[in-house]
Design a protein with these regions (language model features):
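Positively charged n-region of N-terminal signal peptides that target proteins for export
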Residues: 1-4
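N-terminal pre-domain segments of enzymes
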Residues: 23-67, 71-73
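Channel- or pocket-lining gating/hinge segments that regulate access to a cavity or pore
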Residues: 229-232
């Protein structure tokens, strides 16, 4: 018993002597923990760095095709709809930088602000995630659906998000200064609603932690695809294959539509992919190289995999 008590005292002393860990911004090791299967480049903060070229390709594929690829691999909680947007007609994509907000609780807010002061942070806690943004990021925030006094950006912070990310935001919450935000060049955002009130009675609780946006789960570094239909959060480790598969579906659909219009598909309006049809498809691609957005080597690989399945 004495030995057990002594061991407990030593263990307790060790823990009490350990430095306190940051509670708001996730550490690099914490992000690595949640994204361990990613083998590509990373930002200094640990987030997976999905390639810029892939972000550009993502906006040109139907969201259903990417969703289907992700869902078939067990990621069933990655899509959320029901948004308002600054520019609904303009899709955009980027890498998730996440933030979580909660209703104000005095003791939590005091601790969070003290931590921010020690780290040299300035301004309200709603400014802290913006300072972390990199070019190509999408600022994704869980504002627990609050719109009235839940306005996470107005025109000043909107301009700050645009300047740092050159992309936009996705807020499960509100915004203000909607008209002025719409005038910011090369900037878009999805949000739950507009209200003229300033944000109040809420505070930041996490930066770059896994968060929930409606029925979707978001991990820092996810590829965020925003289109009129809704928002899809694609795990970084699946992003390249998901976009490539969606592009291949686009190509085979376009070829099939052309066959249907010309009557060459006969009764095979969908499917019917024989060896002869695949050969005709390749010739069609060669005659229409502008339709190929992926590298030719990637196309050849995906086509070979598809032919094996038939």
């Amino acid at each position: 018993m004495k030995r057990a008590i002594a061991a407990a005292l030593v263990l307790g002393a060790a823990f009490s002597a350990s430095p306190a860990f940051a509670q708001v911004k996730q550490t690099r090791d914490e992000i690595l923990f949640y994204t361990a299967d990613w083998t590509g480049e990373r930002f200094p903060d640990g987030r997976p760095m999905v390639a810029d070229s892939l972000l550009k390709r993502a906006v040109n594929v139907p969201i259903e095709d990417v969703w289907e690829y992700v869902r078939e691999r067990g990621y069933r909680n990655q899509f959320e709809s029901g948004w308002q947007a600054l520019h609904p007609e303009k899709p955009f994509a980027g890498r998730a930088l996440t933030a979580q907000y909660m209703p104000t609780r005095a003791d939590m807010e005091k601790a969070i602000k003290a931590e921010g002061k020690a780290e040299g942070r300035t301004g309200g806690t709603n400014m802290w995630p913006i300072a972390e943004l990199q070019t190509g990021d999408v600022y994704v925030a869980d504002g627990f659906g609050k719109i009235v006094e839940g306005t996470l950006v107005g025109s000043n912070l909107g301009n700050a998000v645009a300047a740092r990310s050159q992309t936009g935001f996705v807020f499960d919450g509100g915004i203000r200064d909607q008209e002025e935000n719409r005038q910011i060049p090369n900037f878009n955002g999805f949000y739950r609603g507009y209200d003229p009130s300033a944000w109040a009675d809420m505070h930041l609780t996490a930066i770059n932690a896994p968060i929930r946006i409606g029925r979707a789960v978001v991990v820092p570094g996810d590829l965020v695809l925003c289109k009129p239909e809704g928002v899809l959060f694609v795990p970084a480790l699946l992003a390249e294959e998901a976009i490539g598969a969606a592009e291949m579906t686009q190509l085979t659909d376009a070829f099939n539509f052309e066959l249907n219009r010309s009557g060459r598909n006969k009764a095979e309006f969908e499917g019917g992919w024989t060896a002869a049809k695949y050969d005709a498809f390749v010739k069609w691609i060669e005659a229409n190289p502008d339709k190929l957005k992926m590298p030719r080597a990637e196309f050849d690989r995906l086509l070979a995999e598809r032919r094996k399945k038939e």
